Swiss-Prot record:
It catalyses: phosphonate(out) + ATP + H2O = phosphonate(in) + ADP + phosphate + H(+). It is an enzyme of class 7 (translocase). Signal peptide: none annotated. Its EC number is 7.3.2.2. This is Phosphonates import ATP-binding protein PhnC. The complex is composed of two ATP-binding proteins (PhnC), two transmembrane proteins (PhnE) and a solute-binding protein (PhnD). ATP binds at residues 34-41. Keywords: ATP-binding, Cell inner membrane, Cell membrane, Membrane, Nucleotide-binding, Phosphonate transport, Translocase, Transport. InterPro entries: AAA+_ATPase, ABC_transporter-like_ATP-bd, ABC_transporter-like_CS, ABC_transpr_PhnC, MetN_ABC_transporter-like, P-loop_NTPase. SMART domains: AAA. Residues 257-280 are annotated as: Disordered. CDD domains: ABC_PhnC_transporter. Belongs to the ABC transporter superfamily. Phosphonates importer (TC 3.A.1.9.1) family.
Length: 280
């Protein structure tokens, strides 16, 4: 069981995360949604201990993660893999080496400093790349890959950590619909095949509905919705995202990752432009 207990984070006078309490069972796939600035990324960074809570505590399997130091903290960051929107790869290193870097917290300091990897680690890394369908890129410099390929390398690196939990911070925000689907399929496969808890921040409602068994909605740093996708009503969406300047609710197709929804959104946008042009 993973728990957040009244977790708060302040940046000066700004309250980024406000008294968040959640309990997540092992093996769940949870999507966190909300507008930019809602506190989603700050929340994940506190879970991984990249940032410290101003108050409250984080617990996993009965251990207070927010109190860990030294090797115990490094062990937690090994067990709690993090995937970022901007991939966080080393561009000049080849893909295989980038993936094997996921083993750093499993190894001695000397071997880590010298970047010496065992044959078993290389085999494991290639298997992770094969699972993500990008084994052919193993010897390419990571910086030469497309955004979708780089994100799959980041997922393969996370797998190398043998994590108990995977945190994905806006993993598809910069990807086209096809690559977004590939990345989300990979995260769901990890969740279903290994039973690993996956918590992912998403800016697209349809993605959260299609991939996550539980959705948490944040607004102004607080949790304003926590439930199944089927419970995410228009009223709940309005509470999470608010309304536009004309008082209308959010159009889910405008933030969709699906190809069909993208086309519908573009049609709607084109229609608005044409209408505005006709008025003028």
């Amino acid at each position: 069981m993973f728990e957040l207990k009244n977790v708060t984070r302040r940046f000066g006078k700004k309250l980024a995360v406000d008294s968040v309490t959640l309990a997540i069972a092992q093996g769940q796939m949870v999507g966190i949604i909300g507008r930019s600035g809602a506190g989603k990324s700050t929340l994940l960074r506190m879970i991984n201990r990249l940032q410290e809570p101003s108050s409250g505590s984080v617990h996993f399997a009965g251990v207070e993660v927010s109190g860990l130091r030294g090797q115990a903290l490094r062990n937690w960051q090994r067990d709690c893999a993090m995937i970022f929107q901007q991939f966080n790869l080393v561009p000049r290193l080849d893909v295989l080496t980038n993936v094997m870097l996921g083993r750093l917290n499993h190894r001695s300091t000397l071997m880590s400093l010298l970047n010496i990897f065992t044959r078993e680690e290389r085999v494991h890394a290639i298997a992770a790349l094969e699972r993500l369908g990008i084994e052919q890129t193993a010897l390419q410099a990571a910086g030469t890959l497309s955004g979708g390929q780089q994100q799959r390398v980041a997922i393969a690196r996370a797998l190398m950590q043998n994590p108990k939990m995977v945190l994905a911070d806006e993993p598809i925000a910069s990807l086209d619909p096809l690559n977004a689907k590939i990345v989300m399929d990979a995260l769901r496969d990890i969740n279903e095949r290994e039973g690993i808890t996956v918590i992912t921040n998403l800016h697209t409602l349809d993605t959260a509905r299609n991939y996550c068994e539980r959705i948490v909605g944040m607004a102004g740093g607080r949790v304003v919705f926590d439930g199944k996708p089927s419970e995410l009503t228009a009223e709940a969406v309005k509470e999470i995202y608010g309304t536009d300047k004309d008082g209308a609710g959010i159009d889910e197709t405008m933030t969709s990752t699906s190809l069909e929804s993208k086309r519908r959104a573009e049609d709607v946008s084109s229609g608005r432009v044409a209408k505005a042009a006709a008025v003028h």
